[in-house]
Amino acid sequence: MSKKKVLICATNYGTWGEELQAPWDIIKAAGHDVTLATPLGKKPLPLAVSVDSDFLDPVINAKTNPPEVCKRIKELTDGTEWNKPIKFKDAKMSDYDCIVLTGGLGAMIDMANNWNLHKLIVDALRTNKLVGALCYSVSTLVFLRDPQLDMKSVIYGKKIAAHPASWDFYGPDWDFTYDLYGATPDNKGTDVHTPGFLWPMEHLVRDAVGPNGTCVSNYKANRANPEVCFDWPFVTGTSVESSIAYGKKIVEVLATLK
């Protein structure tokens, strides 16, 4: 397997820790060169709830953060490995073989409609390079429209994994905040409040892939049975339970490329 150069992109407003940690560790362990990029060029910090091993998802009524995963995320956050990401606007897709988007609720704020990130993805698509997106970062693909496809989404006609609508934090009196683990005065994320999740990924993806595409929204996905889709050039994953499978699938596909 030849070593590849992989650009890994993350939000500055709250990753779901494992959705960055797992693909980061897996792609590095496979021997590839990784470069981290964020919108602001600041360390990507995890949502505090994503490093809380006692957190019980109130919708699916299950714990989502294994203690050993929380420990590893904190090691990376407290250490230096993620200290100096480049800005999206300073990255050039010509320097990389693959672009990997990671998830977290913050992705809906600063990745989904980010012009600089969209340009990187367009440049990847135009040069036939692998593009990955996990959980809420799939929204970046939804909102990226292609003039060569009559302004349809770049995922039109594709098979794409989507966070199930039945898992969304949606209901009366939700007040969701984006508190970060490891926040500092110059990297504190946002104090925005949203009434649950910002938007329903499943519905957006169904619309974006169109009648000839497939939205795979598997509400039964779990750590034992994760959900990842591969439809060149896209690798997409459902949510945090599929983070490891997402990283492994990217490594698997990279191994097939010259």
Ranges and model annotations:
Residues L134-V138:
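Short, thiol/selenol-centered motifs that function as redox-active sites or metal-ligating centers
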